[in-house]
């Protein structure tokens, strides 16, 4: 039913920005099987279809963005282990920092001090909109934020998208993706993922 409600948002239909269209078409909704999908599916057989689909998206995003650091906030150990493997499959040289649900504030310091491209991976049920807004403000041009499990806490996403300027955001139902760039006009795309 979710897929049908977003049928008009398939494969980048209606997106005028060449950059955003390319990201949707070749990163978010890429259907070509990447080199590590099969191995990772064997390594994590307990992952359901949605978590496997999300993991494959993480691999493609890391492959595209080549972040120097990923900061994961609010996940349990099992989720972090699986997500770390998918992100690392896309960018083997990245540094990984995992922060539990109760320790979200140190992530803000980590994001503000580290050089290079960052990717913040946040669990929507474990954070609030105020914290996420502050985290995005500390990021630099070219950084990404993945708000995972968005379907469990839509209010956080809606509040962040409403508050922030100079972002391009993609609502993919299961997760949200924010790209930080002060030179771009604010855009929010709904994607059939």
Name each region found by the language model.
Residues 146:
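Feature for secretory/organellar precursors and membrane-associated catalytic proteins
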Residues 143:
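Glycine-centered, small-residue-biased loops immediately flanking beta-strands
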Residues 1-140, 150-193:
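A short alpha-helical cap/connector motif
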